[in-house]
């Protein structure tokens, strides 16, 4: 789960894929013009932002076409707290990592470079900058 710690963001209301459960704090991307959860292979330039509220199968509007709230960074260095699969260490600071899924950083992979570690909070939690959207740094 990603939670903004500091920096400027804006809230955008975007269309979501109907009948799709998503968790608050998930990175989201578009598929056929509707939001879906980002995956471990989603490129940074395709990721829109962070979903603000959980979408559950028990929601009254779960199967309804609707707009949902997404938090989108409006400046480059917004800091986010995120869960990490395991093993985050001080040597990871400054390095780019990928996602395990839409909610979790994979510190052992750096194919897509979705986040950059700025602080280690524990072996399973850190602070990161997102490398997403149209300004995402391309993998060298």
Go through the PLM ranges and name each one.
Residues 1-140:
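Surface-exposed, low-hydrophobicity beta-strand/loop segments enriched in small/polar/acidic residues
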């Amino acid at each position: 789960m990603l939670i903004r710690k500091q920096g400027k963001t804006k809230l955008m209301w975007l269309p979501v894929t109907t009948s799709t459960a998503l968790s608050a704090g998930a990175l989201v991307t578009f598929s056929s013009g509707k939001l879906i959860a980002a995956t471990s292979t989603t490129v940074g330039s395709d990721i829109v932002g962070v979903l603000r509220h959980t979408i559950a199968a028990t929601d009254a509007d779960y199967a309804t076409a609707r707009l949902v709230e997404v938090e989108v960074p409006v400046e480059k260095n917004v800091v986010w707290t995120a869960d990490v699969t395991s093993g985050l260490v001080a040597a990871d600071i400054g390095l780019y990592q990928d996602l395990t899924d839409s909610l979790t950083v994979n510190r052992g992979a750096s194919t897509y470079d979705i986040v950059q570690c700025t602080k280690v909070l524990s072996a399973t939690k850190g602070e990161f900058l997102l490398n997403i959207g149209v300004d995402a740094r391309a993998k060298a």
